[in-house]
Amino acid sequence: MLLDLSEEHKEHLAFLPQVDTAVVAEFGRIAVEFLRRGSNPKIYEGAARKLNVSSDTIQHGVEGLTYLLTESSKLMISELDFQDSVFVLGFSEELNKLLLQLYLDNRKEIRTILNELAPRLPSYHSLEWRLDVQLASRSLRQQIKPAVTIKLHLDQNGDHSTHFLQTDPATLLHLVQQLEQALEEMKTNHCRRVVRSIK
């Protein structure tokens, strides 16, 4: 799977061939630090003074490299696919090898950082339900509409939460059909490829 880099990212990465390979390696270290701790303008300003360029150019170069490394790590692309993705940028062979080495050295750490940054969504714990129906009424002028009351228990980071939901059976049936359709769709080849690339 090849990376699809936008023109903006290609422009940001176009600065890399203009500097020494040691500087590109340092940019790689800064890119990983950027993921860990966020942006640090002082680092950009110091590098800009040393290289006699604007700090925006340095920042864009680091951000472009960060994007290249994070997307490659997220998709777990192979060495060959990474080389092909970078080859499109028209860099020298030495720079391509350096970028590949940066990717191989940092991909596990980047995936760990991305997993830590991912939101922790609530997970299902248990479910209780009750069907409420009015059995009799002296002045019943409309059709009886039963209601389904659901008590949903969720876990999120060890915390338990309870949510009460109430709906009519027709809506619940529609919801069940939609969920079953989504589960069937997960069995398609396209969805399997997407899930594989996310892992």
Swiss-Prot record:
Keyword Transcription applies: yes
Protein name: COMM domain-containing protein 2
Function per UniProt: Scaffold protein in the commander complex that is essential for endosomal recycling of transmembrane cargos; the commander complex is composed of the CCC subcomplex and the retriever subcomplex. May modulate activity of cullin-RING E3 ubiquitin ligase (CRL) complexes. May down-regulate activation of NF-kappa-B.
CDD domains: Commd2
Primary site of residence: cytoplasm
UniProt-listed Pfam families: COMM_domain (PF07258)
Family: Belongs to the COMM domain-containing protein 2 family.
Statement: the UniProt record of this protein carries the keyword Cytoplasm: yes
UniProt cross-references to PROSITE patterns, sorted A to Z: COMM (PS51269)
Subunit structure: Component of the commander complex consisting of the CCC subcomplex and the retriever subcomplex. Component of the CCC (COMMD/CCDC22/CCDC93) subcomplex consisting of COMMD1, COMMD2, COMMD3, COMMD4, COMMD5, COMMD6, COMMD7, COMMD8, COMMD9, COMMD10, CCDC22 and CCDC93; within the complex forms a heterodimer with COMMD3. Interacts with RELA, RELB, NFKB1/p105, NFKB2/p100. Interacts with CCDC22, CCDC93, SCNN1B, CUL3, CUL4B, CUL5, CUL7.
Entry keyword set: Cytoplasm, Transcription, Transcription regulation, Ubl conjugation pathway
Top-level taxon of origin: Eukaryota
A GO cellular-component term linked to this record: cytoplasm
All residue ranges annotated as the COMM domain in the record: 123-190
Gene: Commd2
Localization: Cytoplasm
